[in-house]
Amino acid sequence: MKFFEIGEIVKSHGLKGRMKAKSYVENGEDLSSVHEAMIVKGKEEPRGYKVRKIVLHKTYFFLELETIDTVESADSLVGSTVLIPEDDRAALSGDEYYWRDLMGLQVVTEEGRFLGRIESIFPTGSNDVYVCAGGSREILLPAISDVILKIDLDKKEMVVRLLPGL
């Protein structure tokens, strides 16, 4: 079974083992179907847990795991990475992508000129914006069909058309 990172535990939250974690998933991603998680702390072996509850809130999520029911047990996991099975990811339509899959993609123009790599992504009211860095300058690319022509996750490449002003 393949797992992917969804966040890092930053602190305990409350008295019953609830934890607050910095989220690596975009706000609004549905995590309600997550029933198990792997927790990895440093170079230790991953440990599997049943998920009681997971709630996404802005750039964080709150996590409750079976057997983690005290402040002390939650505190012992601070700094750990939280991973969930690939199968627990919500299905996306053909033109939608998880942010984590876009991070690091090589960005090239339709003429083949290298611009950089996707370094970060942020939402706006109408569409996401991809931050491309590593070339001659940082470029903000709106996630619209006029700009983003093709995304090839197998080649780890995004082909773009630069509009005037970009």
Curated annotation (Swiss-Prot):
SUPFAM superfamilies the record matches: PRC-barrel domain, Translation proteins
Presence of keyword rRNA processing: yes
GO biological-process terms attached to the record: ribosomal small subunit biogenesis; rRNA processing
Pfam families listed in its UniProt record: PRC_RimM, RimM
PRC barrel domain boundaries: 94-166
Transmembrane segments: none
UniProt key word rRNA processing: yes
Subcellular location: Cytoplasm
Gene3D superfamilies recorded: PRC-barrel domain, RimM
Major location category of this protein: cytoplasm
Protein origin, superkingdom: Bacteria
Record GO terms (molecular function): ribosome binding
Keywords on record: Chaperone, Cytoplasm, Ribosome biogenesis, rRNA processing
A GO CC term assigned to this protein in UniProt: ribosome
UniProt comment concerning the protein's domains: The PRC barrel domain binds ribosomal protein uS19.
Similarity comment: family membership: Belongs to the RimM family.
Known partners and oligomeric status: Binds ribosomal protein uS19.
Function noted in UniProt: An accessory protein needed during the final step in the assembly of 30S ribosomal subunit, possibly for assembly of the head region. Essential for efficient processing of 16S rRNA. May be needed both before and after RbfA during the maturation of 16S rRNA. It has affinity for free ribosomal 30S subunits but not for 70S ribosomes.
Protein name per its UniProtKB record: Ribosome maturation factor RimM
Lineage: Bacteria, Pseudomonadati, Thermodesulfobacteriota, Syntrophia, Syntrophales
